[in-house]
Amino acid sequence: RGSLRLLSGFVRNPAKNGRRPDIPDSTIVSRRGVGVGPAIAHNASVSLPRQILPNQFYMITRRCTQRMMLLRPDAEFNALFEYCLAVAAARYEILVILSCVMSNHHHTVVFDPHGNISEFCEYLHRLVAKATNALRGRRENLWSSEALSLVRLVDPEDVLAKLVYAATNPVKDGLVAKVEDWPGVNTLGALLDGHAIETTRPKY
């Protein structure tokens, strides 16, 4: 079974022999950067012209179809999502900063050095949909047709604000008293501690 390390910080996975691995198993190392540019939003149901540039920060939000609780936390799903996120990030050289998965949506803040954000989002959500449907024993679409939000973050203050918003989402929604009490994926602890999250390819 392949495995990889996902560091919830400014990260990348170096491709072996200069190539992007399809199923990577190398170590993700830390990296810092700053992105600039106007805020944008992308609706998955409408094809809108948008400018994709390298060296940009983004916040990604996507909701489940009909806001169903298909991302509800349990050990199997948490491991599944972390692995899919790590694989997609390595494939498109996206630097994952923080991800918080609620029961019917996720918020993920990333840094895109190469302008691969669209391909990353498509690949990530396809992987998560296939694996989650297999886990849940369902065949219908997982994601809402209208709910891919991709917001470019202009400066470090914007990045910090979105990190706080994403990390504290379970508390804001009144589900837990403290961030660390949320049983779902929330990589704030790894970001603050600077440690890697070990992920292993699930059977799904």
What does each of the following model-derived ranges do?
Residues 1-204:
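Short catalytic/metal-binding and nucleic-acid-binding patches
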